[in-house]
């Protein structure tokens, strides 16, 4: 799951530039995604997630670390899925009239999990169901909000984020 946890903070660090929605509005008159979702953030975030996944693959293969077996496909799907989940949440937030940075408990914490899981289930279901067992799922559900909050507070302290959530 580490390849899914890395992309969002890296996207925040590296973001800026052209918004993915090209500043266009949806049929409701609101932005499709908003300025917080940029091509630079997407590319950097996915690359960082894939890179950390490749490190995991290397550690398991070289040092026989007891980590979930990853593949290049699984780390790519987890990394991309995490950011697609975040974008999906942003799309829904805009439809609900929520502003960029406005807190949306639960959705803010689990969007990356939903996106990563959905993309992986669609394109690599054998890997997903072999690795994401019930104990692993429970661990992810418990760890994710704590990790999310901690990283966001850190991002706020170092002035990468305007809000600590």
UniProtKB/Swiss-Prot annotation:
EC number, as in UniProt: 2.7.7.67
Annotated GO CC locations: plasma membrane
Keywords from the named record: Cell membrane, Lipid biosynthesis, Lipid metabolism, Magnesium, Membrane, Phospholipid biosynthesis, Phospholipid metabolism, Transferase, Transmembrane, Transmembrane helix
UniProt-listed GO biological process terms: glycerophospholipid biosynthetic process
Major location (coarse): membrane
Enzyme class (EC, first level): transferase
InterPro entries cross-referenced by the UniProt entry: CarS (IPR032690), CarS_archaea (IPR002726)
GO MF: CDP-2,3-bis-(O-geranylgeranyl)-sn-glycerol synthase activity
Transmembrane region(s): 41-61, 72-92, 103-123, 127-147
Cofactor: Mg(2+)
Pfam families for this protein: CarS-like
Stretches of the chain forming a coiled coil according to its record: none
Membrane topology according to the record: Multi-pass membrane protein
Catalytic activity: 2,3-bis-O-(geranylgeranyl)-sn-glycerol 1-phosphate + CTP + H(+) = CDP-2,3-bis-O-(geranylgeranyl)-sn-glycerol + diphosphate
Pathway terms, separated by semicolons: Membrane lipid metabolism; glycerophospholipid metabolism
Protein family: Belongs to the CDP-archaeol synthase family.
Name used for this protein in its record: CDP-archaeol synthase
